[in-house]
Amino acid sequence: MAKPAATAAAASEELSQVPDEELLRWSKEELARRLRRAEGEKVGLMLEHGGLMRDVNRRLQQHLLEIRGLKDVNQRLQDDNQELRELCCFLDDDRQKGRKLAREWQRFGRHAAGAVWHEVARSQQKLRELEARQEALLRENLELKELVLLLDEERAALAATGAASGGGGGGGGAGSRSSIDSQASLSGPLSGGAPGAGARDVGDGSSTSSAGSGGSPDHHHHVPPPLLPPGPHKAPDGKAGATRRSLDDLSAPPHHRSIPNGLHDPSSTYIRQLESKVRLLEGDKLLAQQAGSGEFRTLRKGFSPYHSESQLASLPPSYQDSLQNGPACPAPELPSPPSAGYSPAGQKPEAVVHAMKVLEVHENLDRQLQDSCEEDLSEKEKAIVREMCNVVWRKLGDAASSKPSIRQHLSGNQFKGPL
């Protein structure tokens, strides 16, 4: 194809370069021959051009098909790109929402942690105050117990002195009535009544006045023994004196029953008093050891010598009798009418009434403190605080699992968190 084209081009150049004089000199045959040859060359060129055009058209068609395919691919890619853009926008919105929620949770966590630590500090402060109060009550209880033992020792000395004075002052032919008068003179001051006031039982079924007649020989020489021990003593003042009088009233034996001869020995009475007090102290110690968290208020009071009615009801009957009526005395075999100088059985001593009032004031204060603590937060607020605590502890646990330093810090402060 390239060779005929080159030949035709060369022929046309030759014809175009041939001058007119040369053409006029040629013959007709030469001109016709050259003309046919030029026409043949033109036909060949036209055929060649047609083939080239078909080739170009075929290639153009192929390119058009490729362009259509690329357009389809481009359209699909654009659709995918649009979907990806929408997905990116959606994810960006979620990211913004997540960041906003994370900031809110951080603020909530800081607020919750502050509230929790504030509550923990308040609880620890209250716990320290309660422990201080408990220690003070325990110290006061120990002092009162020591005072009880001291009073028991003084009473034993007084009883021994009174017994010696009574045994020496009733000599001669006083007989059994002088011993009964000495017993009445010993028991009268201990119970709070005047010596010789009211009726007494002489043991033979008849009752006579403790003062006796003026001409009776057995009562004429009887003098009530002194209640103070020998040696200089000053009267108790303030709280110690009131406590001593209250303990004397509580520990005094009940004299509203007649006492047969031989059962009111001062030493045996003192021993029984000590035994009852030891049993009472052991019962208090056992109850204090067995008291749980629900009996914290009872444990905090330290089981003082004055118990409330609810606490008395929880004690055994022997302890109730010891607390309400004083130390136990031997029961008589034959009861007699009560003496006129003593209060009836239903009436409580003044010291017990005063102790009940003090305990009632303590219980009212404790109830007010408990009510004020419960009124600080409602049930809904308590539930919210618990949920906040759970969230904070979960976040602290996640942080501890990811960072060893936080785990070590939490393990070192595990006893400083809220209860």
Curated annotation (Swiss-Prot):
Q: Where is the composition biased (Pro residues)?
A: 224-233, 329-338
Q: Which residues carry this modification: Phosphoserine?
A: S178, S246
Cell compartments where the protein resides: Cell junction, Tight junction; Cell junction, Adherens junction
Q: Mind listing the UniProt keywords for this protein, alphabetically?
A: Acetylation, Cell junction, Coiled coil, Developmental protein, Phosphoprotein, Tight junction
Tell me which domain of life the UniProt entry assigns to the organism this sequence originates from. Answer: Eukaryota
Presence of keyword Coiled coil: yes
Record-linked InterPro entries? CCDC85 (IPR019359)
Q: Composition bias, kind Polar residues: at what positions? A: 307-325
User: By its UniProt entry, which Pfam families does this protein fall under?
Assistant: CCDC85
Bias class Gly residues marks the residues at 164-175
* Region of interest: Disordered: 162-268, 307-348
State the similarity comment.
Answer: Belongs to the CCDC85 family.
Query: Which PANTHER family does this UniProt record tie to the protein?
Result: COILED-COIL DOMAIN-CONTAINING PROTEIN 85C (PTHR13546:SF14), RE60986P (PTHR13546)
Biological role stated in the UniProt entry: May play a role in cell-cell adhesion and epithelium development through its interaction with proteins of the beta-catenin family. May play an important role in cortical development, especially in the maintenance of radial glia.
According to the record's subunit comment, the protein's assembly and interactions are: May interact with ARVCF, CTNND1, CTNND2 and PKP4.
What this protein is called in its record is Coiled-coil domain-containing protein 85C
Query: What is the organism of origin for this protein?
Result: Homo sapiens
Give the lineage: Eukaryota, Metazoa, Chordata, Craniata, Vertebrata
